[in-house]
Every structure is written in structure tokens, then in C-alpha cells.
Amino acid sequence: MLFRSQTGKSTTCVSYLLHYAVFNDNVNIAILANKASTARDLLGRLQLAYENLPKWMQQGIISWNKGSLELENGSKISSNSTSSSAVRGGSYNVIFLDEFAFIPNHIADDFFASVYPTISSGQSTKVIIVSTPRGMNHFYRMWHDAERNKNEYVPTDVHWSEVPGRDAAWKEQTIANTSEQQFKVEFECEFLGSVNTLINPSKLKNLVYEDPIKRNRSEEHTSELQSPCNLVC
């Protein structure tokens, strides 16, 4: 999911996780974020939402603390920072990854290498990835592949204009108080310009992420080239 700043992404996802835990027995849910404090904050919001549910909708409480909770129906929710060992060895029905673009590339790669067996072993395991962009990194690659149906993720984009109270006048005021580049990153969710780069973002925009051309070692030509074609050196 590609969300603009302050569009209610955390509230929406936390509400879904709470609903899933209350109305499904014996499910395990993991809330992971780029920082442990952020993950605990999300769990705290979920706990607050639970406390405000009608009494008839609430389950009994087995355990309740800052890092996890367990309901009487056997459902468990835990929170942690995103790392290769965060959910290793566990069995989860839902894994929620918040601000995934802000996870360093090597940690994100190690995380999926360790957690993918857990994901693939469950027939109904859900992975929810939410973030604002931060350059052309692993999250950009996953998002770009999802748009081209090259993976099984479903891209969901929430535009800033869909939020009540945000219109053209609000956009002009926000740009005046910040900058156009900051607005493009935080509210237009442009991957380019979200981090400082040596090469101008307008040039990087032309370098679209593509799969590398496959080469046949036994031959001197590439397998993706088709004749006739023009090569410019």
C-alpha cells in the first residue's frame, strides 16, 4: 500500500487487524515497523480501539502488555522491529509491515529470506506492507513489480485528494509552508526525490527498473534481443 502522510493508514490497518483477531479464533498477527517504538505505538492504538469496543464484542484477556496481547479465543498479536529474526520460527496468519521503505535494503532482504518459508507454508497468510517512498530501493522494486503483475502483491494507492478537507487550496498552502519537493514525496508519493541523490531525479526517472537481460554463456548474443533491431553505441 502506498499511502500519503496523515491519510489514516495506521488507523485503517490497526482496525483491520483488530477485527481479524476478534472474529477469528487462534490466529497469530505480527506488527512490525522500522523501529520497535513505532510497532509498540501501533499495538497501543489497537489496544485502545479494543477498549472502546462494545462489551459484547470483546473477548476475554489472557495477557496484555506493551509488546503483545492474547485474547480468550486464542488469537495473539505481537509487535517488534523489522529484522531477520523478528518472526523466525513462528506461524503467522497476518504480518503487517509499517514504513517498510525505511528499512535498510540488507535488513529487508534478510527479513524476507527468513520469513518467506513462514508465509508460503500458510494457505491464507496475508502480508500487508504500508509505506511512504524513500528512494528507488526494495520497496520501489516490489511496488513496481506489483503494478506490472510480476508478483502476487496487490498495489493500493491512496491519493491525498481523497482525504476530506484536502483540496487545491490546501495543496498550495502546504507547498508554501514546506517545499514542492517535500510535497511530492510526502503527499504525491514520488519515489524520485525522496532521498538526496547525486544524479538529478529527472534523469533517474528515465532509468526505469527492469529485469536484467539474460545472457546465454554458450553464445555471444543475448536471448532477449530480437532481429531486426538497431543498436546505438
Where are these regions (language model features)?
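Walker A/P-loop
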Residues: F3-L17
